């Protein structure tokens, strides 16, 4: 009965009266449909459009594009051009976006939209994953962590490293952390903004998603470290006041106000700001010295993997990591880490 009602309602929807090219649909979306989107989202969409989609599909009418044509194009990108699976997924999202915009503005009829985006047998989809492609979570082993702990100890990047190691922060969240969001008494850290470069300017902006805003619990080791860091900061404010004032950088905060770089947790004693680029040199040196492929985001993977191995309830880990979907968190529970394999073998030997 509900299906009949839905069909009746859809049949009353006005038929498309104006044909639009994909370029016209995208331009209309840019003007009217994405005012609430994040800066990085807009940049990524514009990059895919200008560098790939515009030349191939821009002049085509959106109502003449078939699902097979889209799937063939995605297959070409992934299999023939060798683009990564994750990158090609961005193209799939763009097509869903364009078809959705066209449907909502009556440039696509309901049957065409359902065929392209709803019906599981006909809708556009990613090509089959290659057998040699790895989408597994990359996490550091205990042995690698011991090397990294020793490498970062006492360096300018130690604070950022520990925030990734023991809190699982994203790199932009880490460098956007303000001292006012660190509660040493209760041992918590409030994550409510991130650092970004926008038009070559450093800004503190909104988080990646709504769920990314969260309060993180600090472990005892990190709490002790931050207590010492706060004490050293007080001493620096007294003894290096002139130098800090000279080297400070004024940046734009979340609310548009101007703040000093000295308000950030990742600020050098002399007042100089640290940014996401501060991890570039350690990344190169770790690879050269130890042969470890270090990416800051792998610390987040490691945090999630280790917390899952310790049987942390999924809803708690989801909250701590700021995931918008618990299915993302569940990946850490099914990933096979070295420690997980050891536990599995130990249990197998008990059979």
Where are these regions (language model features)?
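N-terminal DNA-binding module of tyrosine recombinases/phage integrases
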Residues: 1-68, 232-261
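N-terminal core-binding DNA-recognition domain of tyrosine site-specific recombinases/integrases
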Residues: 18, 27-107, 272-278, 293-298
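Conserved hydrophobic/aromatic pocket- or pore-lining residues that grip, position, or stack substrates
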Residues: 53, 70, 95, 148, ...
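Basic, Lys/Arg- and aromatic-enriched nucleic-acid-binding interface segment
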Residues: 85, 89-93, 102-110, 114-177, ...
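Conserved tyrosine-mediated DNA breakage-rejoining catalytic core shared by Y-recombinases
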Residues: 118, 123, 177-254
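DNA/chromatin major-groove-contacting recognition/catalytic segments
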Residues: 146, 200-204, 331-351
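Short, basic (Lys/Arg/His-rich) helix/loop patches that form interaction surfaces
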Residues: 150, 154-155, 167, 216, ...
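Short functional hotspots where side chains directly engage DNA or cofactors
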Residues: 188-191, 295, 306, 315-336, ...
């Amino acid at each position: 009965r509900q299906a009949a009602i839905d069909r009746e309602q859809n049949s009353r929807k006005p038929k498309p009266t104006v044909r639009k090219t994909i370029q016209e649909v995208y331009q209309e979306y840019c003007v009217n449909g994405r005012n609430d989107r994040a800066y990085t989202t807009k940049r990524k969409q514009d990059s895919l459009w200008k560098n790939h989609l515009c030349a191939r599909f821009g002049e085509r009418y959106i109502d003449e594009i078939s699902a097979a044509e889209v799937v063939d194009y995605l297959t070409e990108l992934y299999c023939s051009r060798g683009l990564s699976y994750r990158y090609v997924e961005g193209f799939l999202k763009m097509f869903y976006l364009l078809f959705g915009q066209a449907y909502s503005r009556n440039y696509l009829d309901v049957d065409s939209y359902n065929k392209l985006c709803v019906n599981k047998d006909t809708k556009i989809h990613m090509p089959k994953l290659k057998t040699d492609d790895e989408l597994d979570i990359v996490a550091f082993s205990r042995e690698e962590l011991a090397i990294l702990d020793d490498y970062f100890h006492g360096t300018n990047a130690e604070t950022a490293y520990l925030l990734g190691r023991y809190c699982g922060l994203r790199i932009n969240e880490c460098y956007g952390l303000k001292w006012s969001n660190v509660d040493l008494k209760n041992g918590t850290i409030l994550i409510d903004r991130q650092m970004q470069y926008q038009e070559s300017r450093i800004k503190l902006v909104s988080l990646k998603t709504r769920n990314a805003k969260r309060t993180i619990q600090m472990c005892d080791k990190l709490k002790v470290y931050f207590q010492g860091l706060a004490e050293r900061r007080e001493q620096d404010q007294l003894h290096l006041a002139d130098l800090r004032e000279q080297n400070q950088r004024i940046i734009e905060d979340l609310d548009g106000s101007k703040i000093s770089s000295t308000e950030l947790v990742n600020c050098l004693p002399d007042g100089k700001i640290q940014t996401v680029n501060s991890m570039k040199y350690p990344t190169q040196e770790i690879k050269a010295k130890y042969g470890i492929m270090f990416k800051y985001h792998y610390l987040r993977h490691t945090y999630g993997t280790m917390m899952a191995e310790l049987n942390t309830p999924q809803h708690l880990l989801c909250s701590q990591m700021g995931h918008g979907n618990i299915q993302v968190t569940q990946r850490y529970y099914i990933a096979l880490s070295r420690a997980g394999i050891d536990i599995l073998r130990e249990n197998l030997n008990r059979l």
